């Protein structure tokens, strides 16, 4: 008999109720691990002077580690304590305490309002700037984020890397402050700041004491229209950017893999270009190119200003009008539709790079919103990604890594939101005795099994439970909520659609998951990249 114990209290985990409770705890534990990892890995999708959301991941990690410590304690006792049948009953006092805590958690999961954006208001200023204010009075801090709807996908051949280069130059002074003074002023106010560039947008943020918010808003508004771009600063910074490219891409295997993958998976859409830019384009970039990018895209009517934290909405609105509304609107170019041609056959690329192990990456063309209108398919693919690789006992982990032992690591990556077409990516490292051909065959076989047999109600319920838990964790982080607002708005979606998306995911059926596994996972839309390791030259 296996008992969950604390001091002198015992709870029988071999009883029917005990097994159910332990099963739910296990799901919860695995779900938190997966979602924490997924959330914190999001920073890898962005290019910037530093990676984003360290504070968010740190807070999330601390909270989840506390929960895992409690569950791990139970787990160890579950595995190690053996008792006689005479101990088959449990202490009623402990049961009451444990059950009470569990009921509270269940209540939160079941009845906590799905709306993440209570106390949130949206405004449009006279110059077209969209302002969103999120009041959250749990801590005496505030966050300001400015998102520009311009990323590397808005660049053209020969000018790649401009969005990221301007991100660097935004810290090099304005007509009112000297180079480096922006960061120095934020630090002097006791705050932290950074920026990041993606294929779809560029964003800047500061996190400061609520009492310093007005000063920080004035600083950010200043560089929206008074940036001082000069040749001397640019000539130094472009060398920094080129070195960053060498460090993160040219001399890093994973960087080479995904740069090569995107360059081949897309033939016409600008997603094929790296965010940091091709080295030849960086070598030929001029300060005039950066100035033109700034003049074209950095306008209040092409930006979203998000303020959150221990703030007063009316006060923030007044400050926004004072510092931002005076900035003139611009004629922002209308982005023309850029459709990726239909892929009509498998594409195979072999990359040779310095590495210890071979790698295999499968990338299937997939819908993303709002670029695609296939909303239900995108939702079902999000669920499928979790079924394959969304928790410790997901199919790839359980069957290919632990059971068949043909891979040491498998990851899936699919984001169903983006301004351009999506990719459903499966990346794997084979074991020493497994060929890449066999690994590819087995990965495809797992997806084919789902397309033919579907998934179980247990799998689907587990994933949906994780989605609800993820929403709860997200609401505990002010920075995380503001990040999500910015992401949705920069993609052309209203921030309130976060809850709509969650509800849609909760309504995905087993048949929908089976259907997308059959529809999207075929060789006609597949790009395969294999990595052949080469030894490091001494």
Report each predicted region and the residues it spans.
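Bacterial N-terminal signal peptides that target proteins for export
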Residues: 76-103
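Bacterial N-terminal signal peptides
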Residues: 99-113
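Boundary at the C-terminal end of the N-terminal hydrophobic targeting segment
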Residues: 118-120
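Charge-rich, well-structured scaffold segments of protease-associated domains
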Residues: 124, 183-332, 350, 360, ...
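M16/MPP (pitrilysin/insulinase) zinc-metallopeptidase core fold and M16-derived inactive scaffolds
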Residues: 144-207, 272-276, 390-406, 418
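His/Glu-based metal-binding/catalytic segments typifying zinc-dependent metallopeptidases
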Residues: 263, 332-393
